[in-house]
Amino acid sequence: MNESDAKHWLSDRVSRETMDRLELYHTLLTRWQKTINLIAPSTIDSVWVRHIMDSAQLFDLASKPAHRWLDLGSGGGFPGLVVAAMAKDVCPNLTVTLVESDIRKCGFLREAARQMDLSVKILSRRIGDVPAQTADVISARALSSLSNLIGHARPHMTPKTCLLFPKGMSYVAELETLPDDWQVNAEVIESVTDSDAVILRFRGAHLEGEG
């Protein structure tokens, strides 16, 4: 899949206004990338496929209706800003919160959100220092191991929270490392951008002994 294919895939699924926001996001990202390492340099020529489309696929996998989306370790805004851009027209009541400890990246996130006219919450702090958010959806992309991701997500979950974690082919081994106190069933969904990648979705997950 090339960049043109990715843009076509997106344009079939979102409004013209949303595409305009994503185009602006792409422009801002490539501009800021010259001074801040927002994405891996090797992916700068494939932003639409590797980052924007890869993030956009999570939007349709989330539980509906969702009112609070928490994106952990947002980095350059993936998937958080993409989700917010897609939600603006179709899910205006969705609050997207982006957590990022790097102050410079937070500066980019705030400026991108401002120019894209997105109302998002940006928390510039370490994940472990974030107060409980009671999220309907929690996402994390290219952040940490699955067991660590679940540890990060636990304070913000309810029994109905949907977890969305993109993973590579190591996901099978990672699933085997889940804490014993978790009673979860993972849905393994093939990524639309990479045949060697999946999205792990957990729905209705809860800690043993909790409601």
Swiss-Prot record:
Q: Name one GO cellular component term.
A: cytosol
Keywords, sorted A to Z: Cytoplasm, Methyltransferase, rRNA processing, S-adenosyl-L-methionine, Transferase
Reactions catalysed, semicolon-separated, are: guanosine(527) in 16S rRNA + S-adenosyl-L-methionine = N(7)-methylguanosine(527) in 16S rRNA + S-adenosyl-L-homocysteine
The record's EC number reads 2.1.1.170
Q: Into which EC class is this enzyme placed? A: transferase
Task: State the InterPro entries in the record.
Answer: rRNA_ssu_MeTfrase_G, SAM-dependent_MTases_sf
Residues that, per the record, bind S-adenosyl-L-methionine: 73, 78, 141
Signal peptide (residue range):
none
GO molecular function terms listed in the Swiss-Prot or TrEMBL record: rRNA (guanine-N7-)-methyltransferase activity
The UniProt similarity line reads:
Belongs to the methyltransferase superfamily. RNA methyltransferase RsmG family.
Chain's role:
Specifically methylates the N7 position of guanine in position 527 of 16S rRNA.
Query: What is the name attached to this protein's record?
Result: Ribosomal RNA small subunit methyltransferase G
